[in-house]
A protein has these predicted regions:
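Composition-driven recognition of glycine/serine/threonine/acidic- and proline-rich low-complexity segments
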Residues: 1-135
């Protein structure tokens, strides 16, 4: 007989750990894990006083010890560019108060998370809603 689960209230479900698709270190020295296969999530382990930013709505969960601040990300010009392209008008900064603080980000649609390290002054053009998080 194969082992399976029934729909019984209170039954424990021993689900497998999520697949870790990719691990690495950011340019700022934080470690990250890309979890999952189809609907991936990025889990960052932030260093003390490290700040990252994302568009509004991309954060899935965060641990205690992270301050959150919403801003326009560069003034009126940047705000207008994002409005014209249909992106979120506001950016959210997350700053870790201490070492080893976890925060996770995910997309609203299926796809792969690809880390891209950009040198100062380097830029990339990506499709709408492809941006997830940056340092």
């Amino acid at each position: 007989m194969t082992e399976g689960y029934t729909n019984v209230a209170g039954q424990r479900l021993d689900l497998p750990d999520p697949t870790v698709a990719l691990t690495g270190t950011t340019m700022g020295g934080s470690t990250y894990r890309v979890m999952g296969t189809v609907m991936q999530a990025l889990v960052l382990n932030l260093k003390a006083r490290q700040t990252i930013y994302t568009e509004s709505g991309a954060m899935s969960w965060m641990a205690d010890g992270i301050d959150m601040c919403t801003n326009t990300g560069g003034g009126l010009g940047s705000l207008l560019k994002r409005a014209v392209t249909g992106e979120s008008l506001f950016l959210v900064d997350y700053t870790s108060e201490r070492d080893n603080t976890l925060i996770a980000f995910s997309s609203d649609f299926p796809g792969k998370i690809i880390p891209v390290n950009l040198a100062p002054g380097q830029s990339i053009i990506a499709q709408k809603e492809a941006f997830l998080v940056a340092e």
